[in-house]
């Protein structure tokens, strides 16, 4: 896994809404006999946060780190956030950890499981919510020396992330890129042929 490889894993938490009511030009709802087209994932616009777990460090080395997000559940309930981005690192002492980098490690949910648990609890308490999108960005460590900079490859990190998701989050409440791809050769062709999920 290269450092330049940006992400990878997306989760869509299934909601009970599979369609929406249309509105006529005069502002009235269509009557029940009017044909309603199901709402697909790509019809949804949402508010998202970057480094969704972030807590401003006590001594910030740069102005870019000078912000703090509310906890994930409060972002969802109070701010209407439906897209979250998590940076996931593998730590030999603690498994999958969530933070920005070694100089900016403040976080509202220290482990990947903590983050998933917070969102799962909110989702279960709000069963009619629109889908949540979770972007998971796997991270690896740069090893720097006077004359060389290399990347420490973390074998199996993606597999560990996918395993933790499948162990922790109910499969009937997730949609992954593999689910959308199905039997297609690739994600792009599958979407072109079948469209985005309802």
Question: What is the meaning of each model-derived region?
Answer:
Residues 28-198:
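Catalytic cores of phosphodiester-bond hydrolases, prominently lipid phosphodiesterases
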């Amino acid at each position: 896994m290269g450092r330049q490889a940006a992400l990878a894993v997306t989760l869509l938490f299934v909601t009970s809404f599979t369609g929406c009511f249309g509105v006529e030009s005069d502002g009235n709802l269509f009557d029940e006999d009017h044909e309603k087209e199901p709402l697909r994932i790509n019809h949804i616009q949402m508010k998202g946060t970057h480094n969704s777990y972030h807590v401003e460090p006590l001594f910030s080395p740069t102005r870019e780190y000078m912000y703090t997000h509310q906890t994930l559940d409060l972002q969802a309930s109070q701010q209407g956030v439906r897209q979250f981005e998590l940076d996931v690192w593998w730590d030999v002492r603690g498994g999958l950890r969530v933070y920005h980098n070694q100089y900016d490690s403040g976080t509202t949910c220290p482990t990947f499981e903590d983050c998933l648990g917070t969102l799962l609890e909110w989702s279960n308490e709000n069963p009619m919510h629109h889908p949540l999108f979770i972007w998971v960005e796997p991270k690896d460590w740069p090893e720097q020396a006077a004359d060389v900079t290399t990347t420490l490859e973390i074998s199996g990190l993606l597999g560990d992330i996918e395993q933790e998701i499948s162990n922790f989050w109910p499969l009937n409440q997730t949609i992954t890129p593999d689910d959308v791809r199905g039997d297609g050769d690739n994600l792009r062709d599958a979407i072109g042929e079948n469209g985005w999920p309802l």
